[in-house]
């Protein structure tokens, strides 16, 4: 009888250790998945805010019959991305009265780099023309 109790205790310990290990793995996996969901949600929220902001800028320009204006390079990128149609990979935007630095080139197949997002656009930011490639 003593052997059976010892075997039962050892088996219970092994099973408990296995369950504990599985539980920790499940917690780690769940935590990892949860972080991924939070990141995806934040990106979706940011995209929605950007889209609403660009819609507002474009509607205001359409209402006043003025060229589209952008304050930052990110605004310019989002306007170009919204206006692009079909299989457009690159766009070159020319700013009105911008001088020698009046061209901005965007690769529309990738998101805009973080270090370019908050750069101010030259002059008043009015778009003179857009060349699609």
UniProtKB/Swiss-Prot annotation:
Signal peptide: 1-28
Record has Repeat as a keyword: no
Gene3D superfamilies the UniProt entry points to: Chemotaxis-inhibiting protein CHIPS
Entry keyword set: Secreted, Signal, Virulence
GO cellular component annotations of the record: extracellular region
InterPro entries attached to this UniProt entry: FLIPR, FLIPR/CHIP_sf, FLIPR/CHIPS
Location(s), subcellular: Secreted
Function: May be involved in countering the first line of host defense mechanisms. Impairs the leukocyte response to FPRL1 agonists by binding directly to host FPRL1.
NCBIfam families, per the entry: PRK13033.1
Family label: Belongs to the CHIPS/FLIPr family.
Protein's name in the database: FPRL1 inhibitory protein
Organism: Staphylococcus aureus (strain N315)
Gene: flr
